[in-house]
């Protein structure tokens, strides 16, 4: 039986997309996938339609390693409208309460300090978390509120930028699973006036360089430029991609000699010198250090395969 024909290119890497405002993360993903003519694509944690900023798009084999970015920390710039609370905690929702803004600078500083460090957060009903197999926002749209457990998060840094009139601007560096909308809603309640997000931009994800972020408009311009020069668009698009193992850049590297990597790629744990005592590792092979997958140190100190790169014949 012949192997089914694959649709699109076998292109592997990560594009750091600057998601535009008003577009869902999935719509942005599909546009990038079409521009690159990629056979597979996936993002690494959705941004709300209102939000802009860094959305890493994994193409091809890089989709296998996107899960490691979900665990990474992120940095945001947010502007809150004080005195109004909405049902979604952002400007896309309906105003449900209005109150005067009467807090002092000292009260604001004290309230902000309660959100720094290790805290617990109850996720918004307007989130993609699931309850009994159904997303929370699906319940919310039906007017149903379901129980949610508080989840531990870490706010590594919360910077006060400005407070002018009924606007408050902050910069937040936080752990995975943090809902900025919920921080703003909770802050508004602490201040006694209510608040919601009117602007949100993701500035950074993990250690990705911010100067490598690109817009959809720039991608389209490169496609047009390639057509004018009568060259494949891939020649201009592909250099924009980060390496496919970049989602796992926080993990140590173990390099296997080619004699051992053959066994590893066939699903077998292997012994090698220089491996850590435990945990996940990025596995490369040979003198050129080609990435071949993720491994984990097993109980016998061997490198056991966890996620492998598949090389498709041309």
From Swiss-Prot:
Residues noted as binding substrate in the record, renumbered to the chain: 43, 76, 179, 200
Signal peptide coordinates: none
The active site lies at 48
Tell me a Gene Ontology molecular-function term this record carries.
Answer: RNA binding
- In Pfam terms, one family for this protein is TruB-C_2
UniProt keywords (A-Z) are: Isomerase, tRNA processing
Give EC number(s), comma-separated: 5.4.99.25
Listed SUPFAM superfamilies: Pseudouridine synthase, PUA domain-like
Q: What class of enzyme is it?
A: isomerase
| Record GO biological process | mRNA pseudouridine synthesis; tRNA pseudouridine synthesis
* Catalytic reaction list: uridine(55) in tRNA = pseudouridine(55) in tRNA
- Which top-rank group of organisms is this from? Bacteria
Identify the HAMAP family for this entry. TruB_bact (MF_01080)
Q: Which family does it belong to?
A: Belongs to the pseudouridine synthase TruB family. Type 1 subfamily.
Per its database record, what is this protein's job? Responsible for synthesis of pseudouridine from uracil-55 in the psi GC loop of transfer RNAs.
| Protein's name in the database | tRNA pseudouridine synthase B
Q: Which organism is it from?
A: Shigella flexneri
């Amino acid at each position: 039986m012949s192997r089914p024909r694959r649709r699109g290119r076998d292109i592997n890497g990560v594009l750091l997309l600057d998601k535009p405002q008003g577009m869902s993360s999935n719509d942005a993903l599909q546009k990038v996938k079409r521009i690159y003519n990629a056979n597979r694509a996936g993002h690494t944690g959705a941004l709300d339609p209102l939000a802009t900023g860094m959305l890493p798009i994994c193409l091809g084999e890089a989709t296998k390693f996107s899960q490691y970015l979900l665990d990474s920390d992120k940095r945001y710039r947010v502007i809150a409208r004080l005195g109004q609370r909405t049902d979604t905690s952002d400007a896309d929702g309906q105003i449900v309460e209005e109150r005067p803004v009467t807090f002092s600078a000292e009260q604001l500083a004290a309230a902000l300090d309660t959100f720094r460090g290790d805290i617990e957060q109850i996720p918004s009903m307007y989130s993609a978390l699931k309850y009994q197999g159904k997303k929370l926002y699906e319940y919310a749209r039906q007017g149903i509120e379901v129980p949610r457990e508080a989840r531990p998060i870490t706010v590594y840094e919360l910077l006060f930028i400005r407070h002018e009139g009924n606007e408050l601007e902050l910069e937040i560096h936080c752990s995975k699973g943090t809902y900025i909308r919920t921080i703003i809603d909770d802050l508004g309640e602490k201040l006694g006036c209510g608040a919601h997000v009117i602007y949100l931009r993701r500035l950074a994800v993990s250690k990705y360089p911010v100067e490598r972020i690109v817009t959809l408009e720039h991608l389209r311009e490169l496609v047009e430029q390639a057509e004018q020069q009568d060259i494949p668009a891939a020649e201009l698009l592909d250099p924009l991609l980060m390496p496919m193992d970049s989602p796992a850049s926080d993990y140590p590297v173990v390099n296997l000699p080619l004699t051992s990597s053959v066994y590893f790629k066939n699903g077998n744990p292997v012994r090698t010198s220089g491996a850590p005592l435990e945990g996940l590792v990025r596995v490369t092979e040979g003198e050129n250090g080609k990435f071949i997958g993720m491994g984990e140190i097993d109980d016998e100190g061997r490198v056991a395969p966890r996620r492998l790169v598949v090389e498709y014949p041309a």
